[in-house]
Structure formats: structure tokens, C-alpha cells
């Protein structure tokens, strides 16, 4: 749908997609830990650069994270952080 100049674009992640992203992040986090990496540092590197080399191929973690757009990952992380820090539900 074309946007008018200055109009805010709406982005909505479906609940099933959110659960898929959470499961992938969990798997990637565990794989990075198992290989001795700092999962947070590696995920930040990936999120900033988009370079999959930050993610280990152990347990198919690299293949899994490449199936999800970084904006979807960011939405799930941001939503979780804000809900936990502000004590609010959806």
C-alpha cells in the first residue's frame, strides 16, 4: 500500500511469528553458549551488521537465524524488554 509523505508506517508481527522468533533466539543463544561465545555480544554483532558469521553453525543456529528478518528479531526483543521493565502485558 503506498504511503503518503509524512505518514507513519504500521508494522505488526503475528503471534505465531513471534513464537517462532523466540524459539529461534533460544536455540541460537544455547548454541553460542555451548561453543563458549558470549551470546549477547554475538547477537548484538549480528543485529548491527547483519553478518551471519557472528552466529555459530553449531546446532544449525546460523541457518535458523537467517530464516528470520532482523526487524522481526528486534521487535520481539524490544517488546519483551519493555514489557518486563515497565511491568505491562501486551
Swiss-Prot record:
Record-annotated membrane-spanning stretches: none
Superkingdom in the source lineage: Bacteria
InterPro entries (UniProt xref): IreB
Protein family: Belongs to the UPF0297 family.
Protein name stated in the entry: UPF0297 protein Swol_0469
